[in-house]
A protein has these predicted regions:
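N-terminal "arm"/small-domain region of PLP-dependent enzymes with the aminotransferase-like
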Residues: 1-32
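PLP-dependent aminotransferase-like
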Residues: 70-152, 156-161, 168
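Phosphate-binding glycine-rich loop
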Residues: 35-79, 93-95, 103
Length: 190
């Protein structure tokens, strides 16, 4: 088989305006990573867009989800309910903290976590105190039902909105429904 002559990019870089200026500024001021004026501005604009009080820019969506797991207090051996149809970065941080993912089936309407399956899972594992909800392919899950179930069981919601930046549920931007939320500014997490 002959090798491809050209690369096929998932998302080729596009420059439409002042991107090169901002990249050069970051390079010249030696603020290429996690701090600096450009990062502060990204955080401000993101918080404004999502309608939340604060946003913290990290290196990747996985890092954001890992921070969420730490903030939620997951300890070794803790079971954590997770959406079963998602990118592995949704679940890997649970394992990084020593937690045990328990996968919750998806439902037909949105392909996201099934509230009925979540309720049944709480019957089997009433000790679970963290639920990781992901919105697949830009489609929000059934947040009202999931929040009500989690509230009844005193469970923290970690919202993985990596695939749903710009999507809303009942007029509210995803990335604001959990106790801890992670969004992504990349074209696709998978």
């Amino acid at each position: 088989m002959e090798a491809f002559k050209n690369k096929v990019w998932l998302s080729s870089p596009t420059m439409h305006g002042e991107e090169l200026k901002y990249m050069t500024e970051a390079y010249e001021t030696n603020w290429m990573s996690t701090v600096g004026a450009n990062i502060n501005e990204v955080e401000r604009i993101t918080a404004e867009k999502i309608s939340c009080k604060y946003a913290v820019a990290l290196s990747a969506g996985t890092a954001a989800l890992h921070l969420c797991m730490k903030l939620a207090g997951i300890k070794p051996g803790d079971k954590v309910f997770c959406t079963d149809m998602t990118f592995d970065a949704t679940v890997n941080p649970v394992v990084y903290e020593g937690g045990v993912p328990v996968f919750i089936d998806t439902e037909y309407d949105t392909w996201n976590m099934d509230p009925i399956a979540l309720e049944k899972a709480f019957e089997i594992y009433p000790e679970v105190k963290v639920v990781v909800v992901a919105h697949l392919y830009g489609t929000p899950g059934k947040i009202d039902e999931i929040r009500a179930i989690c509230q009844r069981h005193d469970a923290i919601i970690i919202e993985d909105a990596a695939e749903s930046l710009g999507a809303s549920y009942k007029g509210v931007q995803t990335g604001t429904f959990g106790h801890y939320n992670a969004c992504l500014l990349y074209t696709s997490p998978s």
